[in-house]
A protein has these predicted regions:
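A conserved acidic beta->alpha catalytic loop
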Residues: 39-47, 94
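Conserved catalytic loops of nucleotide-sugar-dependent glycosyltransferases that act on lipid-linked
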Residues: 70, 122-211
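Conserved donor nucleotide-binding strand/loop of the catalytic core
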Residues: 48-80
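Short hydrophobic beta-strand elements that form part
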Residues: 10-14, 59
Length: 211
C-alpha cells in the first residue's frame, strides 16, 4: 500500500496536453522513483495513457494553469505521503533531462539542502533573465523560475500555505531564502524546446516586485 510507504523522494509533474513528451519522460525515469502527475484538463487522452501505465495521477476538470496545478499536486503529496523526505518538481515538456536526476539526488544526499534550485545554464527568455538577475542580486541564488527543484517536504509544508498562486515560484523561493534555510543551486543544461511558451515569468515587474 503506497499510502503506508515512506519515500525518500517523490517526483511531481504538471502536464497539459503533453502526452507524448510525458510518455518519453516516464519511460526514461527509473522505476525506483515514485511519480505523481497532475493532468491540467488535457484533451489529448493524457489521463487514459497514465491509467494504462498505472501511474498515480490526479486531474483537473478544467484547465487551472501551471502554478495552480503544481500547488494542488504538492498539497496532495503532502497530505497523502507526509513522511516523504524530498519532493521534486519536473516539467512535462521534455525540457529537463531525466539523466540529471541521479546526480541531483546524489548532491542532495551529500549537501542536505532545504531547497535545491536546478539553475539552467541556457536560459533564453529575456523575462526570466531579468527575474534571475534581481533574485541573484538579493539572495545570491540563481533561477527561481526553474521548473526543476528539490524541496525538503518539511520546509515545503511550512511555507506552501503562505504562497500567492500568481507568484508561486519566486514567492516560495524568496520565503525559504529569507528565513535562512539552506538553499543551493545545481547547474543543469536544458533541451531547447521550439515554440515553447513560458509557463511562468511572463510578468517581469510583478515577479521583481515581490523580491
Amino acid at each position: 500500500n503506497d499510502n503506508e510507504k515512506m519515500f525518500n523522494e517523490i517526483i511531481v509533474i504538471a502536464s497539459f496536453n503533453e502526452k507524448e513528451s510525458l510518455r518519453s519522460i516516464l519511460k526514461k525515469i527509473s522505476k525506483k522513483y515514485k511519480i505523481v502527475v497532475i493532468d491540467d484538463g488535457s484533451i489529448d487522452s493524457t489521463t487514459k495513457f497514465l491509467r494504462s501505465k498505472k501511474i498515480e495521477f490526479i486531474s483537473n476538470k478544467r484547465n487551472l494553469g501551471y502554478e495552480k496545478s503544481l500547488i494542488k499536486v504538492i498539497q496532495y503529496v503532502i497530505k497523502k505521503y507526509p513522511n516523504t523526505k524530498n519532493l521534486i518538481t519536473f516539467d512535462a515538456d521534455g525540457e529537463h533531462k531525466t539523466t540529471d536526476l541521479e546526480a541531483i539526488l546524489k548532491f542532495c544526499k551529500s549537501q542536505n539542502p532545504n531547497l535545491l534550485i536546478c539553475n539552467r545554464k541556457n536560459i533564453i527568455r529575456f523575462s526570466e533573465k531579468i527575474v534571475n538577475f534581481f533574485f541573484k542580486l538579493k539572495f545570491n541564488i540563481e533561477d527561481p523560475l526553474s521548473g526543476l527543484k528539490v524541496y525538503d517536504l518539511k520546509i515545503l509544508r511550512k511555507y506552501i500555505k503562505e504562497i500567492k498562486t500568481r507568484y508561486f515560484f519566486v514567492d516560495l523561493a524568496s520565503n525559504i531564502c529569507r528565513n535562512n534555510h539552506k538553499v543551493l543551486n545545481f547547474p543543469i543544461k536544458c533541451k531547447i524546446i521550439k515554440n515553447r511558451k513560458a509557463r511562468v515569468g511572463n510578468s517581469i515587474f510583478t515577479n521583481i516586485k515581490i523580491l
